Amino acid sequence: TIIGGPDMIGQGWRMLVECLSIGRCITLPSGATGTARYALGWSGGFTRVRRQFNVPVAEMEGVQEPLARMAALAYISQATVYQTANMIDHGEKPAVPSAILKSQLTEFQRVLLSDAMDVHGGKAVTLGPRNYLGIGYSANPVAITVEGANIMTRNLMIFGQGAIRCHPYVLEELAAKDTNDMKAFDKAFFGHAGLIFGNAARAFTLGFGIGKSSVPFDGPATIYAQDIARLSAGFGLCADAAMASLGSALKKREMISARLGD
């Protein structure tokens, strides 16, 4: 039996990747977020109860630092899972966000579990029925490896796919090239060129502090949104330069692709 009938012969990889873009947005990121909140909850409670030098270890700055990091990573993880789940609810297939989430959140899980093990000390090292962290810590490499190992996702998929899927003109240029549609290609090409020059001008003016990006809201977060807009303009310029200079060889230059993905 062939899924989709005879017309889908040879389309198995495409169907698998399309399903993966949805499933990978839900399973591993949600699992990593659950693990993060679980480890953070136990760590917060344990460090209040555990006392050293007659004070709770939660009051020691050396313990507060990893606890704060754990809280931040757990908050970021939960927020991103809500965002991508909302995208799926609206019928989208977030292939690139799913790759980002899978890679980043399982790496967050690695850091968070290491911090949890550190603040628990010997209690988390000895396996047994009262060790509520050891199994999760030992299972973390599974999440990092399955559904696209993080080393592959980071080096090939995030920017390798994102540079094409998320670009307003590259897909149109490739489609026009395949169909030999010169009119469509010229339209996409000159639009792409205009985007590059516009990005360059925006990146340099914002980089030198000339003008500020408009943001759709007011309040304390405005300055951070403007900083993100400035950095995004610089990133867009770097991405365009990498794509223009390396072309199809960009996927083979995995360290560059990985850094742009980061």
Whereabouts are the PLM-identified features?
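Flavin-dependent oxidoreductase catalytic core characteristic
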Residues: 1-262
